[in-house]
Amino acid sequence: MATVSMRDMLKAGVHFGHQTRYWNPKMKPFIFGARNKVHIINLEKTVPMFNEALAELNKIASRKGKILFVGTKRAASEAVKDAANSCDQFFVNHRWLGGMLTNWKTVRQSIKRLKDLETQSQDGTFEKLTKKEALMRTRELEKLENSLGGIKDMGGLPDALFVIDADHEHIAIKEANNLGIPVFAIVDTNSDPDGVDFVIPGNDDAIRAVSLYLGAVAATVREGRSQDLASQAEESFVEAE
């Protein structure tokens, strides 16, 4: 199963927190000290906590669980999308729309509209419209694709959230808490760990650190899914005998 070592984390700068004046005292148990007015995260805590989170995500994936990757900061946006796509999971990487989980009924209607517009754009419907109407629908399609494209095939609520930056994505975390969906999150020294079921203390800004987290999670999810597929194949083989 995918695991991450202390050396990997040091190389990626996972241990660099935020400036000491921005700290959240609830993160004190995970802070090693400070250097040049920047908090240093204790990787002796982070390594086992991250590997425990990976083991749990692997389990969820092996039971056909759906994992929603959330990272709407510009620096993480593309990496979040790529990681989710690489393990056939789902993502929100632009703006978290309030009610995305707690008001799923309405979101489902918007997803239906997105899929209808996609069909229209491909079956020649747009070409039969006036230029103005076609432009309006194209813009609507782009807007919906931007906000819902990563969850349009999710088919219901996710079984877990993997979040880059607990502070930035606090609305998503709150919604997941309300619905009892487990939250796995990168929590930096300026963030509140409350509401996060699997806290991963670490740098949530450096792209190398973000890529390290996402790469490990995607790998463990792929592994979990392949276990699920292997057990399905075994079952059908037994039935055929």
UniProtKB/Swiss-Prot annotation:
Gene Ontology molecular functions: structural constituent of ribosome
Keywords: Ribonucleoprotein, Ribosomal protein
Keyword Ribonucleoprotein on entry: yes
Any single GO CC term annotated in Swiss-Prot or TrEMBL for this entry: cytosolic small ribosomal subunit
UniProt keyword annotation of Acetylation present: no
One Gene Ontology term from the biological process aspect of the record: translation
Signal peptide annotation: none
PROSITE patterns per UniProt: RIBOSOMAL_S2_1, RIBOSOMAL_S2_2
InterPro entries hit by this protein: Ribosomal_uS2 (IPR001865), Ribosomal_uS2_bac/mit/plastid (IPR005706), Ribosomal_uS2_CS (IPR018130), Ribosomal_uS2_flav_dom_sf (IPR023591)
Family in the record: Belongs to the universal ribosomal protein uS2 family.
Family annotation (HAMAP family): Ribosomal_uS2_B (MF_00291_B)
Name of the featured protein: Small ribosomal subunit protein uS2
Organism, scientific name: Citrobacter koseri (strain ATCC BAA-895 / CDC 4225-83 / SGSC4696)
